[in-house]
Amino acid sequence: MQINCISFCELLHLFTDDVNRNNEILKGACEKADFKKVERLYIGSNFCSRYFLKYVESALKGIAKLTEIESGALKVTLCVPVFSQLYIDSAKKLIKSILNEYSFIDELTVNDFGMIEFASQLNNIRLNVGRMMNKDARDVRYAEYFNLARTPEVFTLTNSVLKNYDINCYELDLTSRFLDVKNVNENVAIYYPYVFATVGNICEFAGVSLPIEKKFRSNYHCAYDCVRFANEYRNEFGNEYLKVGKTTYFKVDDFVVKADKPYRMVYEPFDGLKSKGEQK
């Protein structure tokens, strides 16, 4: 059985204090995903600490006023990226504050081992392993590899590093067109239709509006132009790519999930919601 979820990670900036607009954003995402009912939202960022720290609080204020949140029909998973030493203390403080303020958040998704240790010490919150921790190779250009049925290797972590932690769910990408989780005991959440291919350290969009001598500098302040631009690419084989912030995704519309118990499908509504620039 498929459990319908929608991720607004990397799309936090869309939410404002306009209740009607926020409800329309959710409605539009559900229509795009062809969901008659959605059971969970994913909020935050999996890939950019600066984006998370700047937008998550204002977004949650808007999301808290969604009709389905106020009625108790929707629960929320808070996703957090990897934080550098520069931001780690402020990030932990912010995460604790958010979890204390918003009771509709009942899960925390983390993307590195250090944050797993931090999150495991929090009360009344379920812990998820984020998609950044699944290191499986992924490249849609190599059809003979991508079209093989495979089980993600991240589950081997449960028998080693993660065996001492109470993990609620593993979040995955479609690293294979035929994703086999049939013999997996753990709960899984699968993001689609975009698969993250790679994440860079230096963000192209951080300095779109900056002079050339200040572009591509990881230690320079961010202009947050990722909220205004995204790049689309297509190769000669018809594969579609999308670059949002530091992250490059490829699109997979045709896929099969083999499972013998309920699993989450997490729709990413980049299409139609993300303002795209003209650069291709």
Language-model features and meaning:
Residues 1-65, 74-280:
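Active-site pocket-lining/capping segments in soluble small-molecule metabolic enzymes
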